[in-house]
Amino acid sequence: MLIEFFNGFVKVTGWPAQKLIFRTKIYYEDKQAQGRHIRGGAMVVSNHTSVFDYAAYLFVFFTRTLRVQMAEVLFQKQPLGTFLKMMGGIYVNRDTHDFSFMRESEELLNKGKVVGVFPESRIPKPGEETPLPFKPSAACIALAARKPVIPVVTDGNYFGKGRAHVLIGKPIDPRDYADPERPEKENIQALTDAMRERIIELERLLDERVNAKA
């Protein structure tokens, strides 16, 4: 409850500033299938362009509290680490074999919460092909919780003279990839591949939508 309250406070007080910083234009693959309001438990998966992706999505999905998986390095910086804990950030230690973040994410989904994941696990470096290969943990969690996966892409155009652009895609049902005749590892890989392919498709669609308005 405290996490929801703190998120609400941050979003209400930060609304004027984000209008200047992000000026986000939101597009939809199919608004009837999935709009900005997320009903029930769901996982939001996105490409990763900047440390500000999380901040932008707080306001894109204004009506829900995003419990986002975050790298250990962010929690090591103060006072940022304390702030992220208060916002409900899910601690992910990429340097160890601690998978407690997966259990925590699944539990949150089963409680009807919204979990945010950047499956690339880091921001791509200049010159790298994007999106980077997806880590399998997101698919593993989605298959276990059997909650919809909402693919979202951003162009990361923050702080510029233009505006940020975000496209919300149609949900992916992980149950479509839970084939009892296949080994679990193959199901996880199939969903991982499907999520990455959808992000690539949505990046192309977002580029088309933005350029059509130019």
Residue ranges and their predicted role:
Residues 30-37, 106-107:
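Short amphipathic alpha-helix with an adjacent loop that forms part of the alpha/beta core around
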Residues 25-27, 96-100:
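Glycine-rich, highly charged phosphate/nucleotide-binding loops
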Residues 2-5, 102-214:
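Non-catalytic C-terminal accessory region of glycerolipid acyltransferases
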Residues 36-96:
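Catalytic core of membrane glycerolipid acyltransferases/transacylases, capturing the structured
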Residues 31-33, 73-75, 96, 156-158, ...:
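Residue-level detector of flexible, active-site-proximal loop/helix-junction positions
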Residues 1-31, 78-87:
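A transmembrane-helix-recognition feature enriched in membrane-embedded lipid enzymes
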Residues 17-23, 44-46, 91-95, 126-129:
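Short, flexible loop segments at the rims of nucleotide/cofactor-binding pockets, characterized by
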